[in-house]
UniProtKB/Swiss-Prot annotation:
Belongs to the VAC14 family. It comes from Danio rerio (Zebrafish). It is found in: Endosome membrane; Microsome membrane. Scaffold protein component of the PI(3,5)P2 regulatory complex which regulates both the synthesis and turnover of phosphatidylinositol 3,5-bisphosphate (PtdIns(3,5)P2). Pentamerizes into a star-shaped structure and nucleates the assembly of the complex. The pentamer binds a single copy each of PIKFYVE and FIG4 and coordinates both PIKfyve kinase activity and FIG4 phosphatase activity, being required to maintain normal levels of phosphatidylinositol 3-phosphate (PtdIns(3)P) and phosphatidylinositol 5-phosphate (PtdIns(5)P). Transmembrane segments: none annotated. Forms pentamers. Component of the PI(3,5)P2 regulatory complex/PAS complex, at least composed of PIKFYVE, FIG4 and VAC14. VAC14 nucleates the assembly of the complex and serves as a scaffold by pentamerizing into a star-shaped structure, which can bind a single copy each of PIKFYVE and FIG4 and coordinates their activities. Interacts with NOS1. The gene is vac14. Pfam families: Vac14_Fab1_bd, Vac14_Fig4_bd. The C-terminal domain (residues 523-782) mediates pentameric interactions and is necessary for the formation and maintenance of the PI(3,5)P2 regulatory complex. This is Protein VAC14 homolog. HEAT repeats lie at residues 5-42, 89-126, 171-208, 212-249, 442-479, 550-588.
Amino acid sequence: MNTEKDFSPLTPNIVRALNDKLYEKRKVAALEIEKLVREFVAQNNSAQIRHVIQILATEFALSQHPHSRKGGLIGLAACSIALGKDSGLYLKELIDPVLTCFNDSDSRLRYYACEALYNIVKVARGAVLPHFNVLFDGLSKLAADPDPNVKSGSELLDRLLKDIVTESNKFDLVAFVPLLRERIYSNNQYARQFIISWIHVLESVPDINLLDYLPEILDGLFQILGDSSKEIRRMCELVLGEFLKEIKKNPSSVKFAEMANILVIHCQVSDESKSTNDLIQLTSMTWMREFIQLAGRVVLPYSSGILTAVLPCLSYDDRKKSTKEAASACNHSLMKLVTPEDDEDDEESQTKSSPPSDEAPSKKEGDLNDSLNESQESVGFSNISFFTPASSDRSAVTLDLDGIVQVLDRHLHDSSTGMMTRIAVLKWLYHLYIKTPRKMFKHTDSLFPMLLKTLSDESDEVILKDLEVLAEIASSPAGQTDTSGSCDISDSKTELHIPGSKMTDLSPSTPSMNSYFYKFMINLLKRFSLERKLLEMRGAFIIRQLCLLLHAENIFHSMADILLKEEDLKFASTMVQTLNTILLTSAELFQLRNQLKDLRTQESCALFCCLYRSWCHNPVATVSLCFLTQNYRHAYDLIQKFGDLEVTVDFLMEVDKLVQLIESPIFTYLRLQLLDVEHNPYLIKALYGLLMLLPQSQAFQLLSHRLSCVPNPELMRTLEDQKVAVKDKHLAQPHIDYSELLQHFDRVQSKHLEVRHQRTGRSEHPDRKLM
């Protein structure tokens, strides 16, 4: 430095001492400067004061020489001390050169700068608040300084500044938040610790309402929560916990909608840094749970995003039990928000609603979403779904039904989706069909194929929920439509006669079924045809559950009608055998069995005829149907025709099963009728016919023993009065043409024989036959 240069009002001795390498000499110079400035203050000579500060700043603090810079720093601090309460008038000139030295490469100089600024701030106190942002910016850099002395000095200055902010009521939070939002994305641990400590302080000041600006810093807080430092994570958890307490205490002023997407993002765990992200996910899921409960329908526009985050968590194991429980609570609370009012047209709902003005979207929301999108990449969230509200008009909160259905459908299609998640998806679909049937039926054609495919799921519970959804689709009045087109029924096999309204009016108690009922039955049978393992393993289970969920009579009537036109005769026979077993053995079919047992009404006779025509695909099932309906003479006539059929091992096994059924509680009434030989001769003849069909087997012995218990076998002859009795019984069933039914049986069995012979001719392994 040129010592001959004029630095007045600084004396040459002061200038020389300020440039000295010894701290003690620079300190003496500082005391001289302090005395000089005090004189100027006493004289109210502000021009000279500014001149001194300018010289110290430009010629010393910003000098190229390190010792000069040190002298300038201590000199500026001395000026501040001399100015006292008047230092506020010169703070910019005092602070700026000191902050510049924060970037110096010399750690000792950075320490002196920190010391100088401490003295300046200590004197000015609240007057420094207008310059808070530049002070905070400088301190945030020193917080990550590698030198421990500098870091220690910055901590002292930091504590002083926090005390000033805490005791003041003039802190400009609006001006500070943009800087805070920028700095909160720092990856440096010390910088993060510094940021968190400041948020904690500001949050604790009663006059500072940081909650209003939480949407702008919440994303950054969740990213800090994923820090590798346990201490930083603990501090961040504490801050987030305090914010959540404040939210729960005063929910009316919280901008829930602006923070919903932030939580959606952080509720979804990326693969990177999985252990820390688990904490982020649990915390954000806890927040989401509280938000849904506190904000209610305000979060509905974000429901698709919430479900994207929540649904996968429902399949977590006990290692993430807390997250799973929080997700379950979110899911349950969100589901409760959907009401029948959501089924109204948007125009209707808007005219009815008069929401509070505080639900209007913030102007900053778009900018916030942009910053969120940018920040995702830095923390491994680049592949995570981000959702925008269903409607930008928050004045009328509407359900994002299209988005929800899209999310649910995607989870059903994903083979990796866990069982509990699949169950939750199906519960959602069922709930939506109950609450918003009119809107949901617009999505039914796209959902229907996947719902049918879900019947092949490994879990019984999933299948049960799936059947509930399908049953609701099939029975909902909202599904009434004139269109007969179906999802996934382009195959010629499924171009069947869809029963009209008369088919649904089988009995006064039969509920009306919509067009999807028949589409469902057609597609269900088609699926059984394509997946024989499904029919074998789950067919009876599925049909029995449907009989509980829907009207059993409708199910059997429609399936019989469809099977009547089935071209795959082998499948038709197998399906009839399955349906017949269900009809005869399932507790769910008790009422239907009673309806068929007597055939006293026109409706029951019509049902019998419908079932009979399809049951003809399986001769033994047809006989068992006749036994159930007490058509013993017709059963006997059918058994007489068995001699013309191709008797296979499978056929005899079915006869064996029928004998076992006759011994079961289902046919108790039939066995008791054996006591009345006089009025049931054809029952006995039919049973003897079965006996003659059987080889010498256990079933043969069983039936033979039963028939040996029949009293007075000589009375089995058909007498004239018995013919009258039988005739009288048939007169009670005027709607059944038994001769025509017998002819139909012959035609169906002829087709089966023809197909069997064709198959035998093409195959080297024909059906097993008895020679």
